[in-house]
């Protein structure tokens, strides 16, 4: 599946989820979202990609490793493996007035090595897939090509939060740190601005 300017709808729940993911983790998540969007719209996937729903309603994905890399010169396969391991360890929390859930983001990641045709397989639970596809709380629209080309995870997060907004939107620094899952990482406001805001602004400009 070539990267094009196809707009992707991402769950508002996921966009504002409190997490701190690497660039490669974000690229994997973008591919999950894109494939699920194809499923929702009933469109046919490129033959290099597949998604199967098991008898337990789990979602089994298969994607080429090349689809996670920035371009043909990117050969950071070690970072891809680390990204899958990190995603496997992470949980996503969902909470509304009636429900609280804490779930592993992905399960059973596996990489099949075959040169330029290497691919990754992994499983997503039905509840996590529902979080990805839950548009009941609003949505953000953004272009996959743009999102995939950012080199900073913070650029990706700002792009998700601000894309398609036609009116000004304000976030406090504390609110952004909470959304980005930074905790006490940048206690000084100046450090947060220098390490997060300025690098992201350079890419977004």
Regions inferred by a protein language model and the residue ranges of each:
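Charged, alpha-helix-forming regions
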Residues: 1-205
């Amino acid at each position: 599946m070539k990267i094009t300017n196809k707009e992707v709808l991402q769950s508002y729940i996921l966009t504002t989820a409190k997490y701190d993911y690497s660039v490669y983790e974000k690229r994997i998540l973008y591919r999950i979202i894109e494939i699920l969007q194809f499923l929702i719209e009933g469109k046919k996937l490129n033959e290099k990609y597949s998604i199967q729903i098991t008898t337990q309603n789990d979602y089994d994905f298969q994607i080429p490793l090349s689809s996670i890399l920035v371009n043909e010169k990117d050969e950071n396969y070690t970072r891809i493996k680390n990204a899958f391991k990190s995603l496997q360890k992470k949980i996503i929390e969902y909470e509304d007035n009636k429900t609280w859930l804490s779930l592993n983001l992905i399960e059973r990641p596996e990489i099949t090595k075959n040169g330029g045709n290497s691919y990754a397989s992994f499983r997503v639970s039905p509840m996590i897939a529902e979080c990805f596809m839950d548009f009941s709380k609003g949505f953000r629209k953004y272009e996959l090509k743009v999102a995939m080309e950012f080199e900073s995870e913070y650029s990706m997060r700002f792009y998700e939060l601000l894309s398609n907004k036609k009116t000004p939107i304000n976030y406090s620094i504390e609110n952004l740190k909470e959304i980005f899952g930074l905790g006490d990482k940048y206690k000084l406001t100046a450090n947060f601005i220098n390490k997060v805001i300025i690098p992201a602004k350079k890419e977004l400009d």
